A protein has these predicted regions:
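N-terminal compositionally biased or targeting/leader segments
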Residues: 11, 27-28, 64
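Cysteine-centered motifs
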Residues: 8-9, 16
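Mature cores of small secreted peptide/protein domains
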Residues: 13-14, 21, 91, 222
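Chalcogenol-based redox active-site neighborhoods
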Residues: 34-211, 218-224
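Short, Lys/Arg-enriched N-terminal segments with co-localized hydrophobic residues
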Residues: 15-37
Length: 224
């Protein structure tokens, strides 16, 4: 609890009230300031060294079923859980595009996955995913739809965006935030923390295990 509160104080929002809600998986922070309210969820931090769970999902861009084994990179595989409408994702989209494009020639495959419930959030449906990918210039190796949400659960994904970097053997070396920027703290979006992990991995240098959880909108889980 204390560590969560400490993080609240460092993300740069002008807080006047903090409400913690324990949903059994993660703490959700509700920030209320000057009439502004936003629910934020932290990533659950998959244990380092975990092997990437396999999957076979529908690619919204090509219309094909694609597996992790088909999409994995020669040097590294970056999996990002995103969705179309999330303000946290839209805030960092330029860096998401840049990282995918800049690291592809270095042997890094970048796979985006959307796991949101499209009944409640139709703007995240596959046809809308395909349109967004085209608008962004189709930067990812795939933009996959996790209809059953089983893949998000296998990766312990909790928020959008949620980042998972795996080495050439598909072992997790980084799970955490892109950088310190959020939609409300006015920090520049640089992607430096994820870039540092990518650069270390590609250079053969150990990735710093001190990693900070990502923060974003919660994945929109289907009603039970």
């Amino acid at each position: 609890m204390e560590s969560v509160l400490n993080r609240c104080c460092t993300i740069g929002l002008p807080l006047c009230k903090i409400v913690l809600v324990n949903d059994g998986l993660v703490f959700k922070l509700i920030f209320i300031s000057m009439g502004y309210e936003m629910a934020a969820t932290y990533s659950t931090m998959m244990p380092l060294g975990t092997e990437a769970p396999d999957f076979n999902l529908f690619d919204s861009v090509t219309g094909l079923q694609l597996s992790l084994q088909t999409l994995r990179g020669n040097k590294a595989t970056l999996i990002i859980f995103i969705c179309n409408h999330c303000p946290y994702v839209l805030h960092v989209k330029e860096q998401l595009i840049a990282i995918a494009e800049q690291y592809l020639p270095k042997g890094v495959s970048t796979i985006a996955i959307s796991s949101n419930d499209i009944v409640a959030y139709p703007q995240d449906a596959p046809d809308k995913m395909r349109a967004l990918s085209a608008e962004w210039g189709n930067p990812f190796d795939a933009y996959l739809f996790d209809q059953s949400q089983a893949v998000a659960k296998a990766y312990q994904a909790a928020c959008t965006p949620d980042f998972f970097l795996f080495d050439s053997e598909l072992k997790c070396v980084y799970r955490g935030r892109l950088d310190a920027a959020t939609p409300k703290n006015n920090l520049s979006v640089t992607g430096d923390e994820l870039r540092n992990a990518l650069d270390a991995l590609l250079s053969g240098t150990p990735v710093n295990p001190e990693q900070i959880p990502s923060i974003g909108c919660n994945i929109k889980w289907q009603a039970l």
